[in-house]
């Protein structure tokens, strides 16, 4: 995985707040695990933080300074919650008690045994074992505790607006679109392997093949039941299943029409998606068809897409089409959280070759501010797995391709959790002072930008030649008094700004941080209005 920003910890488990979770003064190099280290400790150490004798000693000294007993159950519960509040979730930036993860806290009558449940945001948390180990450690350090019982669970699958959704979608927590406007770049390969990666991480997963004209799912997986069945009582479609993953495709509907007009196709997609009895799912992965047509609009109108994963190849033509897709998702208010560059390279004779060139995926990341980029090699087994009906991550779960998809799965899990917890827009326009207010995510910093400065620094192909870097839009082309008409967030990495001339600009947060800031702020003329 290539990350063009500082990498965030690959899980929902963060190094708890100082001083408890400070790493040792001489940390063990990454990958240099002790032979006696537990898998959870090894995973933590791989991320640069782990249980250390020094920290355990601090815990014991702290425990020795405290009372060896508590007066009541309520006092005991307070002690436990204070101890657990030392564990910080990196994505939400607060402790697990404030996040509401601690459930069913019970103290025995003898005030010696503690039981509680940690309810994570998703069962696919990549190092949930480390979370459990950390909770055991901090509670066991309390001087009056003799036994700790920790149970791990996940929040029930429920979208934010379940009551407003079709019945079939009301129990799905996250809907992920895997998309590329260009055909033949490997969307279906990425969608299927991502789905089985998430399932392998412990999530309940479904796949929806939204390509009516060329469904790929019946070829890429081989379920025993290859026909969709309708429940005669509820009139809902029962999805077929393979290795624990539910799936629906027009290819499983039997012999149907081969030629359909646009409205008919949209109706078929709507029916297949919304009348299917998906049950409770943590993630529904949608394999989007190529293009930016009626089907895409139908899907975004019917299903509340949580995020999109963009698939591309190194060729320039693929980049041009993918850029259209990213802008489509911007207008439909769907954040793009990762780019997968497929068929990127192959290794031979100890060397790495790039037969289709380099840079297309990186250009998408840089131009649109998408924080994560993943490279997939040209590999015969990856192609063959799509023909044999067994996904590559299932056939070779320890291989290099599976490791790349594991990193992609961690990214998707992490970004979806952040998106679902968003409570406010990070960027707004203050009409009273004619300035754009920017509050960077995960930071208390707020600053002001001149709207014309933001517009002049657009990185898109309309403003800058993506191959030569030549500026197309000149300084004088943008009036000083230009004002944005609308500002809306694109996940955790960028905002989409609509200008009076109809231009839609995608402005990554890291770009906004580097722009010249307003110092002499004009006096307010009217009441401030947030976009």
UniProtKB/Swiss-Prot annotation:
**Where along the chain is composition biased (Pro residues)?**
17-27
Gene Ontology terms describing biological process: iron-sulfur cluster assembly
Transit peptide start-stop: 1-62
| UniProt keyword ATP-binding present | yes
The molecular function terms of the Gene Ontology recorded here are: 4 iron, 4 sulfur cluster binding; ATP binding; ATP-dependent FeS chaperone activity; metal ion binding
Which SUPFAM superfamilies does this chain map to? Fe-S cluster assembly (FSCA) domain-like, P-loop containing nucleoside triphosphate hydrolases
Low complexity: bias regions: 28-37
Keywords, alphabetical? ATP-binding, Chloroplast, Iron, Iron-sulfur, Metal-binding, Nucleotide-binding, Plastid, Transit peptide
Query: Disordered: where is this region?
Result: 17-37
Q: How is the cofactor bound?
A: Binds 1 [4Fe-4S] cluster.
Question: Which cofactors does it use?
Answer: [4Fe-4S] cluster
Regions crossing the membrane: none
Q: Which PROSITE patterns match?
A: MRP
Name one matching Pfam family. Answer: ParA
Domain of life according to the entry = Eukaryota
One GO CC term of this entry?
chloroplast stroma
Q: Where does ATP bind?
A: 181-188
Q: Where is it localised?
A: Plastid, Chloroplast stroma
The record, for PANTHER family, names: IRON-SULFUR PROTEIN NUBPL
Annotated HAMAP family: Mrp_NBP35
Q: Its biological function?
A: Required for photosystem I (PSI) biosynthesis and assembly. May serve as a chloroplast scaffold protein that specifically assembles iron-sulfur (4Fe-4S) clusters and transfers them to the chloroplast PSI and ferredoxin-thioredoxin (FTR) complexes. Probably not required for assembly or stability of plastidic 2Fe-2S clusters.
**Entry's family note:** Belongs to the Mrp/NBP35 ATP-binding proteins family.
Under what name is this protein listed? Answer: Fe-S cluster assembly factor HCF101, chloroplastic
Per the UniProt record, the source organism is Oryza sativa subsp. japonica
Classification of source organism: Eukaryota, Viridiplantae, Streptophyta, Embryophyta, Tracheophyta
């Amino acid at each position: 995985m290539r990350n063009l920003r500082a990498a965030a910890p690959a899980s929902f488990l963060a190094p708890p707040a100082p001083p408890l979770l400070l790493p040792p003064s001489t940390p063990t190099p990454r990958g240099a695990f002790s032979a006696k280290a537990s898998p959870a400790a090894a995973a933590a150490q791989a991320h640069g933080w782990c249980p250390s004798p020094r920290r355990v000693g601090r815990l014991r000294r702290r425990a020795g300074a405290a009372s060896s007993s508590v007066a009541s159950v309520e006092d005991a519960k307070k002690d436990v919650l204070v101890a657990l509040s030392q564990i910080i979730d990196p994505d939400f930036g607060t402790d697990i008690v404030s996040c509401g993860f601690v459930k069913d806290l019970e103290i025995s009558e003898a005030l010696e045994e503690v039981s509680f449940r940690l309810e994570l945001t998703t069962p696919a948390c990549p190092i949930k074992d480390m979370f459990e180990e950390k909770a055991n450690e901090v509670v066991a350090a309390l001087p009056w505790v003799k036994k700790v019982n920790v149970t791990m669970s996940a929040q029930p699958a429920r979208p934010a607006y379940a009551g407003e959704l079709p019945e079939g979608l009301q129990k799905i927590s996250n809907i992920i679109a895997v998309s590329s406007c260009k055909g033949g770049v490997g969307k279906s390969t990425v969608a299927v392997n991502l789905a089985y990666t998430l399932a392998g991480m412990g999530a309940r997963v479904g796949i929806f093949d939204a390509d009516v004209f060329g469904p790929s799912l019946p070829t890429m997986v081989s379920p025993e039941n290859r026909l969709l069945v309708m429940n005669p009582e509820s009139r809902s479609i029962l999805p077929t299943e393979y290795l624990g993953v539910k799936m629906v495709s027009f290819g499983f509907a039997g012999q149907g029409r081969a030629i359909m007009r646009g409205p008919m196709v949209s109706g078929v997609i709507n029916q297949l998606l919304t009348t299917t009895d998906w049950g409770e799912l943590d993630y529904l992965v949608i394999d989007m068809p190529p293009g930016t047509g009626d089907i895409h609009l139908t899907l975004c109108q019917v299903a509340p897409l949580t995020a999109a994963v963009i698939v591309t190849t190194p060729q320039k033509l693929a980049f041009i089409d993918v850029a259209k897709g990213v802008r489509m998702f911007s207008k439909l208010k769907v954040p793009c959280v990762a780019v997968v560059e497929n068929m990127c390279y192959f290794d031979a004779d100890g060397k790495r070759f790039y037969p289709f060139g380099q840079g297309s995926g990186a250009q998408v990341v840089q131009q649109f501010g998408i924080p994560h980029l993943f490279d997939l090699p040209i590999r015969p087994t990856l192609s063959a797995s799509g023909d044999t009906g067994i996904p590559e991550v299932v056939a070779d779960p320890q291989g290099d391709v599976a490791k790349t998809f594991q990193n992609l799965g961690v990214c998707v899990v992490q970004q979806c959790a952040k998106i679902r917890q968003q409570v406010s827009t990070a960027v707004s326009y203050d009409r009273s002072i004619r300035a754009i207010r920017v509050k960077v995510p995960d930071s208390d910093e707020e600053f002001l930008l001149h709207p014309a400065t933001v517009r002049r620094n657009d990185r898109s192909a309309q403003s800058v030649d993506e191959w030569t870097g030549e500026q197309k839009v000149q300084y004088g082309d943008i009036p000083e008094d230009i004002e944005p008409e609308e500002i809306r967030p694109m996940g955790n990495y960028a905002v989409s700004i609509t200008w009076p001339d109809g231009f839609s600009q995608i402005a990554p947060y890291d770009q906004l941080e580097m722009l010249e800031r307003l110092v002499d702020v004009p006096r307010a003329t009217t009441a401030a209005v947030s976009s």
